[in-house]
Amino acid sequence: MEAVERIENPYGIRLRIFLQPKASRDQIVGLHDSELKIAITAPPVDGAANAHLLKYLSKLFKVPKSSIVLEKGELQRHNKQLFVPEPKLIPKEIEALL
């Protein structure tokens, strides 16, 4: 499975993420093996990192954070899989991987 995959029905983008919590800033770092590495400032405590990741992705894709689905990997840094339905905008870093 690719790090970034376009899905046609229902339309959206599926992301396989390697999450780096407690970073100096929120950013898409690039590919890490077969995953998209994303750094966020939130610590990996009590779901704060996942909540911050959803908020960050909702800003990038211009969708409500409640619409982003964490499909698997809630308690892992590797193999997080998210589905972003009907993104209004696709960031250039992610567009390059499609």
Curated annotation (Swiss-Prot):
This is UPF0235 protein APJL_1398. Belongs to the UPF0235 family. GO terms for cellular component: cytoplasm. Transmembrane segments: none annotated. It comes from the Bacteria. Gene3D superfamilies: YggU-like. Pfam families: DUF167.
